[in-house]
Amino acid sequence: MLLARMNPQVQPELGGADPLPEQPLRPCKTADLLVVKERNGVQCLLASQDSDAQPRETWGKKIDFLLSVVGFAVDLANVWRFPYLCYKNGGGAFLIPYTLFLIIAGMPLFYMELALGQYNREGAATVWKICPFFKGVGYAVILIALYVGFYYNVIIAWSLYYLFASFTLNLPWTNCGHSWNSPNCTDPKLLNASVLGDHTKYSKYKFTPAAEFYERGVLHLHESSGIHDIGLPQWQLLLCLMVVIVVLYFSLWKGVKTSGKVVWITATLPYFVLFVLLVHGVTLPGASNGINAYLHIDFYRLKEATVWIDAATQIFFSLGAGFGVLIAFASYNKFDNNCYRDALLTSTINCVTSFISGFAIFSILGYMAHEHKVNIEDVATEGAGLVFILYPEAISTLSGSTFWAVLFFLMLLALGLDSSMGGMEAVITGLADDFQVLKRHRKLFTCVVTISTFLLALFCITKGGIYVLTLLDTFAAGTSILFAVLMEAIGVSWFYGVDRFSNDIQQMMGFKPGLYWRLCWKFVSPAFLLFVVVVSIINFKPLTYDDYTYPPWANWVGWGIALSSMILVPAYVIYKFLSIRGSLWERVAYGITPENEHHLVAQRDVRQFQLRHWLAI
């Protein structure tokens, strides 16, 4: 099969030029031919001998790509956030706004990123050869992905620590009497509604063995008075973090050929464990009460704006658009791969997984409520408190608790690893495609990236590391990633053009996206993203962790981290504008015209300066 592909680096012609014969609006790519050969299921793309570019690596099998995308999208948030959001926002009624936002915004953005990466075969930065002024968006998402790696790997290290601690007949969070326990440690069997009173939820009680193991045994939080007093890294977590970094390096060092094989384990294991936990969970006493609470339908909650806001933010962060990962993964696909089908399949799998995980979670929460004779609302929670305190405590009361604990933390470990692999691949691919010297030394560059995340993660494994981690989690990938994806949607749909983007998709798959997708890309998705950005800013509150309130300077540091990535977008526009020689018109024209159409600028034929470009759908 022969594919005609072109991306000539045409130098701006500042002088006058004789008019050339009229050319079609979207010239075909006619430069180097890429010969596609199938060898034992591995596709090789061989450039013509005139090209100096190295052949781009491709996925060994289609399933490697699908598992990588699913593994990245399905992460810890599917387990520790969605079920609780569904419960507190009207149960089954929450699925209405959630599904609506999935259809009108989540899937279109997912589809857009896969198609963008697959057609251009570039990472998050160099993919913006379609509109050079927007390359700063690529650098922004790469930096955000790097920030996330600083703290996300620490959560994986916690999971590994818990996994190691589970290999004992008596789980260390089962009872009091350990060196880390406080004098206030209380046997969970003694806790019920009458003991806790009306103002203390069981999920907020800090003196259970499980809560003290997490905060005092693992984090050593009691030895820190705040973010100004974080102390030194803890050697146990340091060793776990080192193991995580080594695993990530050897999963990524040879590119998608190695990571595509690792995800066969990390992406499938969570489904096996989730199924086993679900089957066992529904047999426990009180499980039906938990599931009923999870699925209860309260349509009146849909009148509240917070329900719609929670649905919008959850669908965005759950699918993982905007981190450069989907672009990087898709760039290693075959040119004619059906990324439309992939987008529908993988985004649906992600959302269905979130929903199904709720049954496994709330069956256990129902069991806990039954055991302690409290209401479901007293044990329902989200985040780290759910997966590192409540769920482990529930597991410790089951027959064969060691087996269930090992299984559960293996699932968390797998969920974290393939998501972290995706984020690091976005950084590595994004920068390696932009700087060829990094691509030629991928193994060394991968080592540098993983070690850099390790070094900065050291701040998060100190005795006050949870304060640093919470700050990074709030600011590094909050408003900044929403802003970056908004700019991405505008760059593709408006400056590059939905019609031109649709023609690219037709070249790959033989059919153009329907009117629905084009309308979503041009109007609905940008409006959705703008809504979420505005809401995230309006709803911002000074940072807290439980009862601890961060000092004002910490919030300023957080906003500085957020702005450090966002500022790259306008900064690159200014840099590019100043680096282009020519008149004001020429500078703007070259900045918003795809690189393979720069020759049209010399002919004064710039689509973006014509009204029909902005009206096209």
UniProtKB/Swiss-Prot annotation:
Catalytic activity annotation: (R)-noradrenaline(out) + chloride(out) + Na(+)(out) = (R)-noradrenaline(in) + chloride(in) + Na(+)(in); dopamine(out) + chloride(out) + Na(+)(out) = dopamine(in) + chloride(in) + Na(+)(in); dopamine(out) + chloride(out) + 2 Na(+)(out) = dopamine(in) + chloride(in) + 2 Na(+)(in)
Keyword Transport: yes
Phenotype upon gene inactivation: SLC6A2 knockout leads to major alterations in norepinephrine homeostasis and the rates of norepinephrine clearance are slower in brain tissues from mutant mice than from wild-type controls. Mutant mice have aberrant response to antidepressant drugs and are hyper-responsive to locomotor stimulation by cocaine or amphetamine.
Post-translational modification: Palmitoylated. Palmitoylation regulates protein levels and neurotransmitter transport.
Cytoplasmic side of membrane: 1-62, 117-135, 255-257, 333-338, 429-443, 493-522, 570-617
Disordered: annotated span: 1-21
Any Pfam family matching the protein: SNF
Ranges facing Extracellular side: 89-92, 167-233, 283-306, 363-402, 465, 546-548
InterPro entries: Na/ntran_symport, Na/ntran_symport_noradrenaline, SNS_sf
Binding, dopamine 2: E382
Subcellular location: Cell membrane; Cell projection, Axon; Synapse, Synaptosome
GO cellular component, one term: presynaptic membrane
Residues bound to (R)-noradrenaline 1: D75, A145, G149, F317
GO terms of molecular function: actin binding; alpha-tubulin binding; beta-tubulin binding; dopamine:sodium symporter activity; metal ion binding; monoamine transmembrane transporter activity; neurotransmitter transmembrane transporter activity; neurotransmitter:sodium symporter activity
Record-annotated disulphide pairs: C176-C185
Superkingdom field: Eukaryota
Amino-acid positions noted as binding dopamine 1 in the UniProt annotation, renumbered to this chain: D75, A145, F317
Annotated transmembrane regions: 63-88, 93-116, 136-166, 234-254, 258-282, 307-332, 339-362, 403-428, 444-464, 466-492, 523-545, 549-569
Alphabetical UniProt keywords: Cell membrane, Cell projection, Disulfide bond, Glycoprotein, Lipoprotein, Membrane, Metal-binding, Neurotransmitter transport, Palmitate, Sodium, Symport, Synapse, Synaptosome, Transmembrane, Transmembrane helix, Transport
Amino acids binding Na(+) 2: A73, N78, S318, N350
Protein's job: Mediates sodium- and chloride-dependent transport of norepinephrine (also known as noradrenaline), the primary signaling neurotransmitter in the autonomic sympathetic nervous system. Is responsible for norepinephrine reuptake and clearance from the synaptic cleft, thus playing a crucial role in norepinephrine inactivation and homeostasis. Can also mediate sodium- and chloride-dependent transport of dopamine.
Subunit structure: Monomer. Can form homodimers in the cell membrane; homodimerization is mostly mediated by cholesterol and lipids, and regulates neurotransmitter transport activity. Interacts with PRKCABP.
PANTHER family attached to this UniProt entry: SODIUM-DEPENDENT NORADRENALINE TRANSPORTER, SODIUM/CHLORIDE DEPENDENT TRANSPORTER
Family statement drawn from the similarity comment of this UniProt entry: Belongs to the sodium:neurotransmitter symporter (SNF) (TC 2.A.22) family. SLC6A2 subfamily.
UniProt protein name: Sodium-dependent noradrenaline transporter
